[in-house]
C-alpha cells in the first residue's frame, strides 16, 4: 500500500472525539497574595465586586493552588512572606475553597531557580549529613503543620528549577564529574526531601522541577542512575510574544517544542509531566489568551501531562514586592490581572472545563516529523512510522 495512504490512515485511526482529561490540573501559584493584601491590594471580579483572591481563582476556573515555601525569609531580609506560618495560612484558605494543593519547597530563604540555589543562612556551614537532616526536618515540619489542619497536599515539589542541583554548593551537580557521579550530592539532598514527604503523606506525588522541558532527556537518566526518587517531572514554560510572532517567518513556536518534549519525557521515563509554571506578557492579554489556549490544546492532548499552573496571575505588571527595590528588580511582567485588580482574558483558558484537544499534532524538530497522536508520540522518518522508543509501526 502507498506509504502516504498508510500515513493518512494512521492519523485518522484515532477517534475524533478526543476530550480534555477530567483530572487535568488547572492551577495558579499565588504565593504573593498575602504580601499584596498587606500592601493594600484588592481583587475584583468582572462586575467590579471585591472578591477574596482564592475565591476569585475558583471563579476563574482554577482547580489547584501552588504555594512556594522558604526557610527563613526574615533572616534574609524579605520579611515573613512564604515562611511556614504564611504558607499554612494560605494553604488553609486554599483548602476552604476546595483546591488541590501543590507545595513548592525552595530550600532557600529566597527564590531558588535556574541561576540561584542559595543555602539558607541558618544552614550554612553544615556538613552534607547535617544538611540532609535540615532538609528532612524543614519538609516534615511544614507538612505536619498542614496535617494538623486537616490538609493533605496532592503534589510536593522537592526543589525549584533544580537543573544544576539545590542548596549550593553542597547539593550542586558536579560538572567536573561525568554520568551519575556528578548527580550524587544533589540526589542525596533531593532524596532527603522526597523521603520526608513520603513519611508524612505517602500518597503525595513528589515533583522534580526543571526550568524547561528540553532539559529532561539529559537530566533524568543520570538523576535516576544516581538513585534519584520522584513521581512527576515538573517544568517551567514561558512562551513570549516575540517568539510567537516569529512563527509568521517560519519559526517553530515554543508550545510545539514543549509538547513534543513533554510527550518524549513521559514516554521515556514513564511518569506524568506537569507544567508547574507558565505565564505571558501582561500587557498583551488578547495574545496571552491565544497562546495559553494553544498551550492547553497541546498539553491536554497528551494523557501523561498532568496539568498547567499559571505563575502569580494576580499581578498586573506594576506591583512589586518592597524588597525588589532593594535588589533593583522591576515588577514581574507576566501576570494576568489588569491595573483595576481584575482577571484579564489571559485566564480565559482556565475557565473552560473542556478545552478542545487535537487528536493528533504535527511538528518538525531536528529534521524529522513528530506526531502526537491520541496522546502518544510517534516519529515519521524516511516514510516509516516509529514509536518514541524506536519500534517501527507496522
Question: For each predicted feature, which ranges?
Answer:
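Sec-dependent N-terminal signal peptides
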Residues: 4-14
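Boundary/entry segment of secreted carbohydrate-active catalytic domains
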Residues: 21-56
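Hydrophobic faces of well-ordered beta-strands that scaffold small-molecule active sites
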Residues: 25-30, 65-67, 101-105, 154-158, ...
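Active-site beta-loop-alpha junctions enriched in small/polar residues
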Residues: 31-33, 70-72, 106-110, 158-163, ...
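Glycoside hydrolase catalytic-domain groove-lining segments
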Residues: 47, 51-54, 58, 205, ...
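Substrate-binding cleft and catalytic face of glycoside hydrolase catalytic domains
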Residues: 56-205, 211
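Aromatic-rich peripheral "rim/lid" segments of glycoside hydrolase catalytic domains that contact
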Residues: 175, 285-298, 302-358
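C-terminal outer-membrane/trafficking sorting elements
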Residues: 355-394
